[in-house]
Design a protein with these regions (language model features):
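C-terminal edge-of-domain segments
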Residues: 78-94
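Short, hydrophobic/π-rich interface segment
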Residues: 44-80
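An N-terminal amphipathic alpha-helical segment
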Residues: 2-47
Length: 94
């Protein structure tokens, strides 16, 4: 198991806090707000945020989440079931 350095742990916690506080304001259709979400730090350098059971997502919502994250990141959307998708944000921790 890799020990996550304190600055990266703090940055990941700050991102998680910003998302939990701000997602309701930028997601009026509740496509992400209230959905199951997981946070995972990979190799101590990358934060992966995965939203499951999302009925769909618009580009404006993705951009809003990226603004909340406040760090360089990218997003992927992948089919989960016939009706839902997985929305994954990958953030570089510095």
């Amino acid at each position: 198991m890799i020990e996550v350095p304190a600055p990266q742990r703090a940055q990941a916690a700050a991102i998680q806090h910003r998302l939990s506080e701000g997602l309701g304001r930028i997601d009026p259709h509740h496509r992400l707000f209230g959905r199951p979400v997981s946070y995972r730090i990979i190799d101590g350098t990358t934060l992966e945020i995965t939203y499951r059971d999302v009925p769909g997502i618009a580009e404006a919502e993705v951009l809003g989440v990226k603004r909340l994250i406040g760090a360089e990141c990218f997003c992927t959307v992948a089919p989960q079931t016939a009706e839902t998708v997985l929305v994954r944000f990958v953030v570089s921790l510095k």
